[in-house]
Each structure stands twice: as C-alpha cells, then as structure tokens.
Amino acid sequence: LTSSNPSEAKRAMAAVSGSTVNALGTAQRDALRDQMGWIRNRTTLMGVNPAYVNDDLPRFHMWMEGTGSYAQLDTRGDESGYRLTTWGGTVGMDADLSDRVTVGAAFTASYGDLTASAADSADGHLDSYYASLFGRYQNKRWAHTLILTGGWNDAKLNRTVNYGEGSYSTQGSTSGWGLGAMYELTYDIYLDENRSSVLQPLFNASVVTTRMDGYEETGAGNAGLNVGRQDWTTGTVALGGRWMGLIGSNIFGREALGEIRVNAAQDLGDRRGETNVTLLGNPGFTQSVRGAKAGTTALQLGAGLSVPVGTKGTVFVNGNADIRDGSSSVNGSVGYRYDF
C-alpha cells in the first residue's frame, strides 16, 4: 500500500478490499437462470398429442436428469469476473390433466466449484438446491409455459492477497436464496402435411432476484473483511425460434424427436455486482467493491434429442450455450423419462 507506483498501490488496495467477493453473487444469479432454462427444455416436450383421442387422462410422468455446466465472466482490470463449473441432478414429475393442460414439479441439487482472479484471487464452492413448479397450456397452435423456481445456496469463498514479498489468506462462508419466474409463448407452424416437423417462433420473458447474505472472513485477523449483502435483480426478454422434428422410430413405432433453438436475448436491470466491505480492523470505514460488467445482449443456442426406449421410456439429451460480450456459458443434461 505504500508503493511509489500509483497503479501498484491502487491494485494493492483493490486486493485488500476484496476485488473478487462479487463472484459469489454474480455466479448465484447466473446459476438460477441456467436452472430455469433446464426446466424450460423439459416442458417443451410435455403435453398430449392433439391428433389422438385422449380418454385416459390424467396421465402421469416422471423424469430424472444429470446436469453439468461451465460459465465464465471475464475480469476487467480490478473488477473481478468468475469461473463456475457445476454438476448435479434433477427429479421431476408432471401430469397431463387435460388435452390442453400439463402441470408439474421438479427438485434439483447442484454442486459447483468457483474461482475468481483480479487484484486478489479466490476459490470456493457454490452449492444450490432448487424447487420448481411449472405449467403448460396448449390451445391449437398456441402454447403458454410458466415456470416458478425458488432456490437456496450454500457458498464458501477463500481469498489470497499478495502484497510485495508476502501474502495472506482468508476464508468466508455464507448462504443465500433466489427466486425466478419464466414465461414462454410459442406458435406452431407445421412444415409438412404429417405435422412431423414444426417451426415455433417464440417469445420468452424471465426475471430473477437473488440475495447472498453478508459474512465475516476469518484467518487473517484484522486484515479480514466484513462483506456486505449481495443483491441482484435481472429481467430478460428473448425472441427466437425452435425447430422440432421426428427423425426415426423404434420397433414399437415410437419416434425420436430432434430439437434446435436459436434466441436473441436482452437483459434489463442489474449488470454488475457491487458490495460494501469493511476491514475488520477498521470497521468505521466502508468501501464499495464492484465486479466486472457482463454484456446485456446475448445469442442463445440449444439442441436436444429424445430417443424412445421400449413402450414407455425416453432417453433425452440437451445442450445450451449463452454467448455475450465478456461472458459465456455452456451446459448440458442427459436423462430418462417414464410414462406411467
């Protein structure tokens, strides 16, 4: 902090002030958005075939999937980004109540490794547990989907601060929660007479709000930080399209279904994390620490394949990507669905 080089002194001050602490709240927000996307991917294949008489309703279904993801936000100077790698699983149930209405619920556990590097460096974990309720209403060619998700997070962040010839390390643990809602509207445009290929223009709107509780660091005495609460609220609107088509059948006459998705999305609301911190040795002085900004306009890509197994089972795989200025993410899932 006493360096004669102003840029070195500024970077040292940023390190002492915890330039990486915003990684927790930013990663928490992005993980919740990924979770709602996974549930959305499942709902697109729900509902009954309107070409048949469905006189045995309600019908019940259950599915399980394993998920994995990698997300990163680029660091910009002393404004930290993050890297988060997650793996987890979901168990879901849904019921076709009528020719038009499907409802369901899903429960997810996800475990993540988190790293960040700016003026200081950090590593830790972000574990998340989600419950989702969803519904889908299909009326002729129009379909409406609503997803509500609540989550609880357990997090840990260990920082290392280098100064001159020395360094010190801190440890911090906290928890948080998040709520999200997503609505999607689609319209079916059949591309052949058999309705085996369909193009769906779509509109999607979502909002998430997250909170990571404040905490006190340990391990470095008075050099540790009291880290304030981290809050995010971000809305997203997207326009795009989805193609779905039958691409073969098994010996029982059940057909595999392929899917491709392309969206252009725009974020509204919070663009970066910002947290108040105080040194434990100087509690009267509070400083605001800012994280790196992510781009607000995104290209979202996705693909999926559902392959029938026997007369009542289906194996499915899905992949998604979100690409924007300064950040990107990819995720995938593989699972099994059973029709009772």
Language-model segments: residues:
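Short, internal active-site loops enriched in acidic
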Residues: G68-S69, S110-Y111, A205-V208, V262-D267
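Outer membrane beta-barrel transmembrane domains
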Residues: L225-F340
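Solvent-exposed, glycine/polar-rich loop segments of beta-barrel outer-membrane systems
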Residues: L1, R76-T85, S117-G124, D154-S175, ...
